[in-house]
Amino acid sequence: MKVVLLKDVAGLGIRGQVVKVAEGYGRNYLIPKGLAEEATPGRIKELARLDQAREERVERLAAQARKVAAGLKGLTVRIPARAGEGGKLFGSVGNKDIAAALAARHNLKIDRKKLELKEPIRSLGKFPVLARLHPGVQVEFEVEVVDNGT
């Protein structure tokens, strides 16, 4: 009996895979537990269509990430912050502040979770930031924290 796996099954296969199993194993265990369904020709075609749509979506997202990376490459983002004596900030500048500055000043909307800082920025100066936009697409840019003069 051929079944289409609806979830990953240890020792059998991954979600979406068509596998051949014993009749009893399929009918008495996999199908009732919602782990698989019978592989009909219509279902196999539908899975192929879904896989193709998923691949197109991933490629589209990768192309968007490459476009954003090109915009970020070599960019210096200036962020004003209140600082005390010696250039120490009152508070810190984090991913959230950098993402907000990118959206406001450069019209680049990037999820703050995709921005990596070695540590929170707690002083004035220039700091490198790594943006992991998509698997295989990452770019480093600079953040310059300046005193806002108040």
UniProtKB/Swiss-Prot annotation:
GO terms, biological process: translation
The entry's keywords: Ribonucleoprotein, Ribosomal protein, RNA-binding, rRNA-binding
Pfam families the record matches: Ribosomal_L9_C (PF03948), Ribosomal_L9_N (PF01281)
The keyword Membrane belongs to this UniProt entry's keyword annotation: no
GO cellular component term, pick one: ribosome
Signal peptide coordinates: none
Top-level taxon in the UniProt lineage: Bacteria
PROSITE patterns, alphabetized: RIBOSOMAL_L9 (PS00651)
InterPro entries assigned to the protein according to its UniProt record, in alphabetical order: Ribosomal_bL9 (IPR000244), Ribosomal_bL9/RNase_H1_N (IPR009027), Ribosomal_bL9_bac/chp (IPR020594), Ribosomal_bL9_C (IPR020069), Ribosomal_bL9_C_sf (IPR036791), Ribosomal_bL9_N (IPR020070), Ribosomal_bL9_N_sf (IPR036935)
The keyword Endoplasmic reticulum appears for this protein: no
Gene3D superfamilies in the record: Ribosomal protein L9, C-terminal domain, Ribosomal protein L9, N-terminal domain
GO function terms (MF aspect): rRNA binding; structural constituent of ribosome
Its job: Binds to the 23S rRNA.
Family per record: Belongs to the bacterial ribosomal protein bL9 family.
PANTHER family: 50S RIBOSOMAL PROTEIN L9
Name of the molecule in the record: Large ribosomal subunit protein bL9
Organism: Desulforudis audaxviator (strain MP104C)
